[in-house]
């Protein structure tokens, strides 16, 4: 009698996706981030569910309810900080996952890549709305500033902002709808993850060499389940160290002050994982231009497959492209640092130069380098 996992209608799907899945034998630890993102999403949904049981989405009681969770609910402080720092881990894995896709040319798997970009936007939207919920100073003013950016769109801008706010300013209606959306979006993200995996398993995984693995594959279990488990242990070590030793390291002290519409904080800034995009937004003096640059800073990933004329899929054997890739990483770290600094010299100039370099690398320099490398290899 054959194994039930290979015949049962439901178990068969799980088996073909996670157990008997034919996998390239040479994928490195950088391919772990997909499963780590799945783990992060699971942690966020579970901790979020428990937080939602005690949270009240009302402007008068939201801040108090978060305080109540931390002080009075059994292990509420742990659940709250695992959720908050879990978001940071989520984005850490996301950036590494996208970076690996760029480095090893995974963007050639178009459907998987495009669903991934939709996922990235969805996770960013979810994280932004989650940051508003504690209703501290930075929550309130962050929501006001970021939603107000939509008013830059001609003709419909103001109506669009008031429609999102549910009034003429950020208030009870805004908080309620943000909570509703923050609750439902992770489940939509889970569905998108399944579509992401469906498209990936249509073509099979890429590998560091960028060559076809069809002639030589190994089952996912036990090889990569073990490897992923090691990655998960390291992720949990980092998350638990953050949560139990430095819970507020990545947060903003202003968020421990209840929201006050009459008092603006000296420096309004989002969480660290949005700072690179925030720096690009601030580097352009024009409001609409800044908003367009902000959106394009992520949306540019969608046109990467069109801009890459390289004959070799990965950067593994292309030293010039590797050098530019690490310059891009350094540039993004610079933008992240600038996003957290006040708007004054020399930070304004550094931010503008880093923004120009970011778009130049993506649109001109890296594709041109690919052409040079093709020429050097006589391809």
UniProtKB/Swiss-Prot annotation:
| CDD domains in alphabetical order | cytochrome_b_C (cd00290), Cytochrome_b_N (cd00284)
Positions binding heme b b562 in this chain are 83, 182
The record describes how the cofactor is bound as: Binds 2 heme b groups non-covalently.
Q: Name one GO cellular component term.
A: respiratory chain complex III
Keywords, comma-separated and alphabetical: Electron transport, Heme, Iron, Membrane, Metal-binding, Mitochondrion, Mitochondrion inner membrane, Respiratory chain, Transmembrane, Transmembrane helix, Transport, Ubiquinone
Protein localization? Mitochondrion inner membrane
The record lists a ubiquinone as bound by 201
Extract the InterPro entries matched here. Cyt_b/b6_C (IPR005798), Cyt_b/b6_C_sf (IPR036150), Cyt_b/b6_N (IPR005797), Cytb/b6-like_sf (IPR027387), Cytochrome_b (IPR030689), Cytochrome_b_C_euk/bac (IPR048260), Cytochrome_b_N_euk/bac (IPR048259), Di-haem_cyt_TM (IPR016174)
Which BP terms in the Gene Ontology apply to this protein? mitochondrial electron transport, ubiquinol to cytochrome c
Q: Which GO terms describe its molecular function?
A: metal ion binding; ubiquinol-cytochrome-c reductase activity
| Protein residues bound to heme b b566 | 97, 196
Q: What is its main location?
A: mitochondrion
Cofactors: heme b
Q: What else is known?
A: Heme 1 (or BL or b562) is low-potential and absorbs at about 562 nm, and heme 2 (or BH or b566) is high-potential and absorbs at about 566 nm.
Q: Which family does it belong to?
A: Belongs to the cytochrome b family.
This molecule's function is given as:
Component of the ubiquinol-cytochrome c reductase complex (complex III or cytochrome b-c1 complex) that is part of the mitochondrial respiratory chain. The b-c1 complex mediates electron transfer from ubiquinol to cytochrome c. Contributes to the generation of a proton gradient across the mitochondrial membrane that is then used for ATP synthesis.
Name recorded for this polypeptide: Cytochrome b
Organism, scientific name? Lepilemur microdon (Small-toothed sportive lemur)
